[in-house]
């Protein structure tokens, strides 16, 4: 997690240089009522998202950045509610983990329970909406994050190219306008 914190902080400082008292809104994807897929070891997407978002919030606050935490309790009423709660923030990050379609899953026993997993889809993707108010800044940040992930040995997945136009495919950045 430390490396990912550094990636975000480097990108954030680059994109907000010269701005006084920035505020970052950090949103936890999914909810307790709709927790998303379950991992190969029984953890929900919401749990992964909340854990990572908690690490990110801690790193930002340690760096002296004001943070607006969104949906950490898992009770967000709707998707539209989240950006509304972030309104006025300088930067909005929504943390998600991606699942895969049922037909690509294999099964195994984990602690006496049958769980699913995949070996097909690996890697990362970073999504940017063309409808956001600072597309150029968001693309610079996303590309910088992807480049840092690649230098650390992570691999961007081409999987998202099936449904999304590339913004910077080499660095795992894709357009997704329905964020």
What are the roles of these predicted feature ranges?
Residues 1-179:
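Catalytic-site microenvironment of enzymes
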């Amino acid at each position: 997690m430390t490396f990912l914190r550094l990636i975000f902080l480097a990108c954030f400082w680059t994109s907000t240089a010269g701005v006084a008292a920035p505020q970052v809104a950090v949103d936890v994807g999914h909810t307790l009522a709709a927790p998303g897929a379950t991992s190969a070891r029984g953890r929900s997407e919401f749990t992964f998202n909340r854990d990572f978002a908690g690490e990110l919030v801690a790193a930002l606050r340690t760096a002296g950045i004001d943070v607006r935490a969104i949906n950490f309790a898992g009770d967000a009423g709707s998707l539209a509610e989240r950006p509304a709660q972030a309104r006025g923030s300088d930067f909005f990050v929504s943390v998600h983990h991606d699942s895969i379609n049922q037909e690509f899953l294999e099964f195994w026993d984990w602690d006496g329970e049958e769980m699913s997993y995949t070996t097909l889809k690996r890697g990362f993707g970073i999504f940017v909406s063309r409808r956001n108010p600072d597309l150029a800044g968001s693309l610079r940040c996303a590309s910088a994050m992807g480049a840092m992930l690649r230098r650390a040995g992570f691999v961007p997945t081409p999987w998202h190219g099936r449904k999304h136009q590339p913004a910077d495919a080499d660095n795992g950045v894709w357009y997704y306008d329905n964020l």
